[in-house]
Every structure is written in structure tokens, then in C-alpha cells.
């Protein structure tokens, strides 16, 4: 039987998952109360600078380095429009049956991280960034809520690598302004706000210094409250350098 190298495994799996979700566990089942689930929304829209994107990618790479058996990682492109749907990828690392890592388990973890880094490269594609027509944070949150619901009782963290400026025809925070409280109440009454109760939300990439940035932050504070969660001031940041700070 042919033995694949780590790079070969990464390339083969990443090629398969370029535009689809790797829905299965990386190596079989996972114990329901083991590990954490990380859901990452990746915004590469034109409103973000190269420095912003480089910082976001480094943070995600560092987070991948910290993943352990039992953890699940989900990557979602913050995007709407164009001929292609938003890209996404999700997979997890199996928890060792006896709780102790074998050499095979360690290789499995390394292979998972290699695939995750390839997926990160795909989602931070600079050519793809030029095709993005709108930034759909609301759609990303709805998809993230679906993944959080299916996280199999893992503690779940939603990391948004974004400036948090929504740009869709219905809500364009640049050209049409920021929706008011009545808009949030209307959506909440119609049960159109995705529920993220119990999910730790962390934002890295937001404008935290200007008046407009403060207004956008105030909007999201109220929106996340309606979604059943809360973003603490320490977790709504322009930049996070240490992945250990991705926590509540």
C-alpha cells in the first residue's frame, strides 16, 4: 500500500475541499465533550488593507498551531455576490480513544494542521479579493450559528477577522449608514437574527479609534445581544497578536 507524505495528504485533501466543506472528522468520530470548536469568519474585502490581512492571517496561522486533538476548525469566507458562492471548510481532529497521543495521533494532528494552512491560503487569496462584490457579515453569522449548533457540545469560539463593515444591497454601512435600534428589534421580532447563545465572540480587525468605528461597534454590541451573546470590550479589537487571547 502506498504511503503518502504529509505534504501529499495536505495537497490531496485541500484540492478536494477547495470550494466545499470538509464535513467529516479528520480521522473518524469525536468524543462529544472533548476539545473546542473554532469558527473563523475571514474578511478579505477591499475595505481592509494589506497590513490588516497580513495580521489576520498570522493570527489564524498561530491559532492553527495551537489546535489539539478533539478541536474542530471551521473557516468561512465573509462574502456575498459574484458567480461563486462563499467558500468554507470545516473539519476536526479525532480525540485519542485512550486519551494518550500515539505517534500516529501526532502525525494525524500535523496532517490536519497542514490541510488547515492550505485552506487558509485559499481563503486569503489576493486574486479572489478583487472579485468580492460585497461583505456579508450577517450571512456569515447565520452560517456560523449553524456550525455552532452542530459543534457537538464543544465550547465554541467565533473569531471574526473583519473590520465589521457590512456591505450588501440591503445593509451598506458605507453608503447607507448604520441601521438603528428599531431595525434590530424588527429582525428580532421576526426571529431573523441567528442565535449564538453560549458562543464566545472575538473580533480582530475592527476600527476602534474613529467616531464611525465607535458607531459600528455600538451597533454590533446591540446585534450580538439580540443574538444571545456578548462581545466584551477586550474582545472587540483592531489587532490581536497572541492567539491565547482568543477566548472569553
What is each stretch, according to the model?
Residues 1-21:
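Sec-dependent bacterial lipoprotein signal peptides
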Residues 34-154, 157-159:
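Von Willebrand factor
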Residues 165-218:
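VWA/integrin I-like adhesion module and closely mimicked acidic/polar interface patches used
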